[in-house]
Amino acid sequence: MVPGRMRSDCQQIPGGFTKEQADKAETMEAAVAGRAQQRAALATPGCQVYWPAPYEVCGAIRDKYNELGGPNSFLLWPTSNELSNPDGFGKRSTFQNGPIYWSPAGGAHPVVNHFFAAWQRQGWESGPLGYPTTDEIPTANGGRRQEFQGAGIYWHLNEAYAIGGAIRDKWNSVGAEGGPLGYPTTDELSAKKNNGRYNNFENGTIIWSGQTGSRLLFGAVRDRWASFGREDGEMGLPLGDEQVAADGTGHFANFEDGSAIYWYPVIGAWRVPPSVLAVFAQFGFESGKFGYPTTAVEAVSLPQSSNGVGQGFQNGSIIYIDRGETYDYYTASY
């Protein structure tokens, strides 16, 4: 440096900053250095100015920023002094590519890009997620996650969504993002029935209610259930997770209204209503002579009754006739 001249007179200023800002930053650097000498005996967390940005970065946030590489990190230059958060406990400093947040419970962590957008949807630190407790962490298949006090945010294919609580526990039990469900494709959402909650995933859904707990449905079965209105439709909530059938190939799930959905490759997923399901059960379900359902239920016109329904199966059909207090059924094998 040349005595009597400012650093900006001798050194090129990085793009985006004015000479006025650079000179202010140099003056602040000198002031911070002077304060540090005066306070050395007090062990007070110090601050640092990163020329040419005229802002102080302090304490644990400064330490995290330096750990990441300071202005050479993905955050680039500071854009604010340290700020107090609305809760009166946490702190934050903003940078060109995102903020670093600090809390007594979680420490200091950057929250940027899609993670910041997902956190914002949940109300930042005042929402159910609370403060960050980790930096971003690499996950399976090129994804990333970041942990917060109340949940995790997972990023994959340029989308990030929050998942927590009992739904996350169920997801973890089947392998999380490396399992058959893949990554979340929504935040945790409200279900109208029983104050439920759910997350959609790349290959299915987990839905929770206080009455049923967390239940898992995969793609085709989930989609058929959705065609009947999901939990608010006639089928209601799933009574259990989707299960692998006895043959090891097909799948099925049972629902509140007494119906079930059966899935088999090529055939697809079909709902079996309670009336037909009762007859289907008498013949051994999918392991019996009828095999898997292949069609939706249709009304059947018969002389005996106007309330008949029929459904096709791999090896025949079942026709159910409602006679009020009693019922008849007819079967046909192919």
Task: Give each language-model segment a name.
Residues 1-334:
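Extended, compositionally biased repeat/scaffold regions that form elongated interaction surfaces
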